[in-house]
């Protein structure tokens, strides 16, 4: 069904300041799940939901890599304590990002 979660899988872990983003693993999991889109989420142990430059770079890079496989990035969420932020929503509001259909 459209919009249904097909899989929720931890893909990486890191330390207080960074985590490796395995783009190929994300794409392979999406293909194996027969997904049309991917939502990515990660935490900020610092307690701030503000995206780092690396967070924004990951959003752009993942979106571009997914598009080459006819997949789209649904969202990239940052979670910090009881708060969350949609990077894709923020970027779309600023005119820096458009969602793939």
Predicted segment positions?
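Active-site-proximal loop/helix of nucleotide/amide-processing enzymes and allied scaffolds
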Residues: 2, 8, 12-100
């Amino acid at each position: 069904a459209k919009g249904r979660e097909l899989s929720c899988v931890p893909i990486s872990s890191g330390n207080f300041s960074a985590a490796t983003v395995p783009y190929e693993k994300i794409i392979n999991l999406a293909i194996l799940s027969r997904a049309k889109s991917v939502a990515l989420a990660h935490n900020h142990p610092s307690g701030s939901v503000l995206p780092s430059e690396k967070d924004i770079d990951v959003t752009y890079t993942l979106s571009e890599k997914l598009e080459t496989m006819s997949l789209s990035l649904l969202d990239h969420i940052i979670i910090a304590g009881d708060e969350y932020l949609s990077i894709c929503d923020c970027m779309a509001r600023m005119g820096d990002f458009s969602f793939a259909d």
